[in-house]
Amino acid sequence: MKSQACLKVCLALIGLVSIVSTAYIANDVVSDYAEVKELLAAFYRKHAKKYGHDYDPAAIQAIAENMDKSVKNDKTEATVNRKLWNEVFENDIILTLPQAESLLSESNSPRSRRQAHPDPRNFWPNLTISYEFYGGEETWRQLIRSAIRHVEQNVCFKFKENGGDRDGLRYYRGNGCWSNVGRVGGRQLVSIGYGCDSLGIVSHETLHALGLWHEQSRDDRDNFISIVADKITRGTEGNFAKRTAANSDNLGQPYDLGSVMHYGAKSFAYDWSSDTIKTRDWRYQNTIGQRDGLSFKDAKMINTRYCSNVCQRSLPCLNEGYTDPNNCGRCRCPSGYGGTYCETVEYTSCGGSLTASSSYKKIESGIVQPDANCVWRIRNPGGNVEVMFDQVNFQCADPCQSYVEVKYLSQKTSTGARLCCSLPSVIRSEGDDVIIILRGTPNTAVGWRGFTLKYRAIGGTPITPATVRPTYATTTRPYWTRTASGWIHIKNPPLYKPDGQIYTSDEQSAETKYSSEELYDPSTFLSPSSSSASPALLLPSDASPQRPSAQEHDLSQLSQNALTRPTPTTTVAPDTASWSAWGEWSACSQPCGGCGTKTRVRACYGGNQVCPGSNLDRESCNAHACAKPKKGMICNGRLLLPCDLLAKLNFGSNNYLNPKLKQSGFARSSTLPLPRISQRKPVFVNELEVHPPTERFLSSSTRRVKRQTANRFCEKRFIYQCPTALLTIQMEYKPDTQGTNDAYFQQYPECCSGYTPRRGVCYKN
């Protein structure tokens, strides 16, 4: 009973420490953060008053906890970081002390259009940045490496794991997802906690570290979005404040509703059914908040800031492209555009370049395939293009996952309107072309019909129907498929007719020999609709897909010979089905130990959709032995307990992780540094000062000291990964049958059950 009472007292003491320190981001994790949070609270209080509200951290925390009970998730850091609303700025930004001071005083400063961090002291001096991991499992590390490769592919920075630079990034499993803005010196933390495990969120936090603020904090944001103030959680209105020239710079780039740095539509909402951000053009509503990866504009911001001197000369890029710092011989083009100088449509196996005429023409996507990536460019030189959708059929999501994107603005840098839920009204281009992009996710379910649209020329010098080739329907099976590190090419994919029949790679689609110009022409990747008099033109099976030449081949510019050539004969697709190419391998089911497996799948198309063999392929993976936990962690700790109680308790870990940590034996309670809950003096000291010591009081004090001396304390030393915002110690009574020395190997086996390690590799018994 006495031991149980002592255990309750110890647990109560630990619980009291936890209650007093409710912060999720401790001051020793981020330098000077206690002072930063005081300034941040003053900033939130100031902005709450502008809306007639008070800043009540307890009320905000209660709303956040209630929201966490919801299964809703917008796939942004906003969902994960609800409990951090009082700890961070704009959901995921860790401010430095100078930034916080500037933030509090900026409301009276002149405003200008700004968005990237302008202080040269926060710029990265080199284009190679060191990074390291601070704990975390291997699958988590691989995700971060994939996100870093994704960033590297789009900007001129290179990242070196475990590099020796003094300044760098340290990714660790903290509470939530957060980062500093710009370089702050030393190994600055980037927290990728549980729930932040996506390529887009890791990229988002990395771009913060490179110097980008959130997109919706730009001064010109009111031209593109409106803030629904009455839907925002009271007291968090300061998270919608706009930046000024004091701490950000737009670098002359337009506002991008598809930026990976943009808030989602429901950020800081007190009710998940409510939007706190509405786009001025409602067709963009499901575009904001995407976390698929960097947009063209996101990368252009970084490259404009850091990479303008990488190449010796600038290329004459079109359509707002710019010289690619990773390949100085080409331009980096906005989505939808391709070619050396961004003069053509982006190369895909489905889609192409089309010219509008005075009468409507039709584009049908067909059934949306997984990883579909198709791009069309519709032109009307000297005029505009009108687009009218008859069907938009995708899985509705906020933001869109699979979608049709329409770029109809005169500026090309920004992301287009992504449609997946609603049918838009008539769209008219601001310039002389429109870009249509079809995207499908890797896990797109079969059955979504995609989109159907019709287009025509408005103004300009439209071509009459008599001078153009028949209307073309399209397919959605890509030659290119998306991976975590970018788009990769699939050799010899199956070719499709509009009715869904398939031409496999070993079938000749036509006996007619085409010229090399025709094979390069994007129009040869299109097949006429069923109303056309001409049969499908299909790429011969022995020809490898080629990228378009530098000069774009428009349908209206085909030679007369091409328009009048004899109708080619085609081989009718057999009634039997055929397999598609294998998809990518899944992640391994185990990080090590020998028993892991990975799988890949393929689809059966055409005919009766019955193909020989299995659609599933399985392979063993990660046969290497599991590494034992390393000793020598950064921080040591100790727990003070009565010695007779300590011997009866089990702990969540053991000291086999570090044999150097031994129990240090007995120690007098008067010399032990007990936890300091507050700055108040002990109660019995106050009593001594206020009242003269009586005989009764002295007798009581003597008995108390005797009890403490007889009940000597022992210390339980332990190690833990630090910095940490929350340290949990698990204790329970040992079962009578349990020994005191658990085998280290039993707790941390090198191989799975049924496998034996030999020279670092696990083999099946």
Curated annotation (Swiss-Prot):
Residue positions assigned to the propeptide: 23-114
Record-annotated CUB domain positions: 350-458
PROSITE patterns reported for this sequence: ASTACIN, CUB, EGF_1, EGF_2, EGF_3, TSP1
Cofactor stoichiometry and binding remark: Binds 1 zinc ion per subunit.
One family name in Pfam for this protein: Astacin
Glycosites: N126
Broad class of the protein's primary localization: secreted
Protein name as annotated: Zinc metalloproteinase nas-37
Expression sites (tissue/organ): Expressed in hypodermal cells. Not expressed in the seam cells in L1 to L3 larvae, but it is present in seam cells of L4 larvae. Also expressed in attachment points of the cuticle at the anterior end of larvae, in the arcade cells in the mouth, the anterior pharynx, the amphid socket cells, and in the rectal epithelial cells at the posterior end of the larvae (at protein level).
Coiled-coil blocks: none
GO biological process: collagen and cuticulin-based cuticle development; ecdysis, collagen and cuticulin-based cuticle; molting cycle, collagen and cuticulin-based cuticle; proteolysis
Top-level enzyme category: hydrolase
Localization per record: Secreted
Signal peptide residues on this chain, from the entry's feature table: 1-22
Domain annotation TSP type-1: ranges: 576-627
Annotated GO MF terms: metalloendopeptidase activity; zinc ion binding
InterPro entries: Astacin-like_dom (IPR034035), CUB_dom (IPR000859), EGF-like_dom (IPR000742), MetalloPept_cat_dom_sf (IPR024079), Metallopeptidase_nem (IPR017050), Peptidase_M12A (IPR001506), Peptidase_Metallo (IPR006026), Sperma_CUB_dom_sf (IPR035914)
Residues binding Zn(2+), per UniProt: H204, H208, H214
A cellular component annotation (GO) from this entry: extracellular region
Highest taxon listed in the record's lineage: Eukaryota
Biased composition (Low complexity): 526-545, 562-573
Swiss-Prot/TrEMBL cofactor(s): Zn(2+)
Active-site residues, Swiss-Prot/TrEMBL: E205
Species of provenance: Caenorhabditis elegans
Span of domain EGF-like: 303-343
Functional description taken from the UniProt entry: Metalloprotease. Plays an essential role in molting, a process during larval stages in which a new cuticle is formed and the old cuticle is shed. Required during ecdysis, the opening of the cuticle to allow the worm to escape.
EC number: 3.4.24.-
